[in-house]
């Protein structure tokens, strides 16, 4: 993986941990998340502090060596764009038959030996998430990555439903792409209460950091903790009740 230099910190790092920007015809620095747009680009570390610094100190003008405007709400914009990319990747994986949702289907996928990534809604109950993460660790020998950065409604969008608590992706390209976007999103998004789940996972020998995960596609991402409400769920009814407690008629 090539390294790029962040305009905010001056530090170099892997390109998949930074975000590329290009200059539009009207002089605006716009994010190029896929790093495919033509023209000269500058790179920014994928975290909120770097984005705030780049806006405040007008670092894009310095990086492009010309006057460059940028969205004042850049950190929030980048968070939204990264969430949208993650939803899109999960949706593509679903259409390719490489992603499932629903508690039972997720458990089955984890036990099948084909799963490369477990995704849990960050506002799902810590107890339910802890149990599913323990299953992933036990069946995958630490090789199944864990992502807990999307809300239940966001995860549901990828599957064409109102919400989803659990999902699993097969090992391979989609899981690798989602893991990369999750690493970048973790610099912008604050996780909901997952401290208990993370602590319990660590107590069971489960890795709490991405660099402790085995395998090229593995990642454990939760982000900083924030005391906020969670979606109530039961272990066997997690994807049948919504955040408001209303019942679902399926467990797709």
Predicted regions and their residues:
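Helix-rich interaction surfaces within compact, conserved domain-sized segments
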Residues: 147-200, 220
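Catalytic cores of RNA-modifying enzymes
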Residues: 2-8, 33, 76, 80, ...
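N-terminal cysteine/histidine-rich coordination modules
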Residues: 1-66
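Helical mechanochemical/support elements of P-loop NTPase systems and associated helical scaffolds
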Residues: 2, 41, 56, 82, ...
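Conserved nucleotide-binding/hydrolysis micro-motifs of P-loop NTPases
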Residues: 13, 49-51, 123-126, 153-154, ...
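Charge-patterned, long linear interaction tracts outside catalytic cores
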Residues: 197-252
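Short helix-coil boundary/hinge micro-motifs
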Residues: 5-8, 114, 130-144
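Extended interfacial segments that mediate partner engagement and assembly in macromolecular machines
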Residues: 49-128
């Amino acid at each position: 993986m090539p390294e790029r230099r962040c305009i905010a910190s001056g530090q170099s790092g892997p390109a998949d941990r930074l975000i590329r920007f290009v200059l539009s015809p009207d002089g605006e620095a716009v994010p190029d998340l896929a790093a495919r747009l033509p023209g000269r680009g500058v790179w920014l570390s994928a975290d909120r502090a770097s984005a705030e610094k780049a806006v405040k100190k007008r670092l894009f003008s310095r990086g492009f060596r010309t006057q460059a405007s940028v969205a004042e709400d850049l950190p929030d914009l980048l968070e939204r764009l990264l969430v949208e990319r993650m939803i899109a990747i999960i949706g593509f994986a679903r259409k390719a038959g490489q992603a499932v949702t629903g508690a039972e289907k997720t458990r089955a996928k984890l036990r099948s030996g084909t799963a490369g990534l477990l995704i849990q809604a960050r506002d799902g109950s810590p107890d339910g998430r802890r149990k599913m993460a323990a299953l992933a660790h036990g069946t995958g020998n630490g090789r199944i990555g864990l992502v807990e950065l999307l809300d239940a409604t966001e995860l549901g969008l990828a599957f064409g439903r109102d919400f989803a608590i659990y999902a699993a992706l097969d090992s391979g390209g989609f899981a690798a792409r989602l893991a990369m976007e999750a690493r970048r999103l973790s610099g912008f998004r604050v996780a909901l209460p997952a401290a208990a789940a993370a602590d319990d996972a660590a107590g069971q020998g489960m890795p709490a950091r991405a660099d402790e995960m085995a395998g090229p596609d593995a990642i454990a991402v939760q982000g900083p903790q924030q005391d906020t409400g969670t979606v109530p769920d039961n272990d066997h009814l997690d994807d049948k009740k919504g955040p408001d407690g209303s019942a679902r008629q399926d467990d797709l």
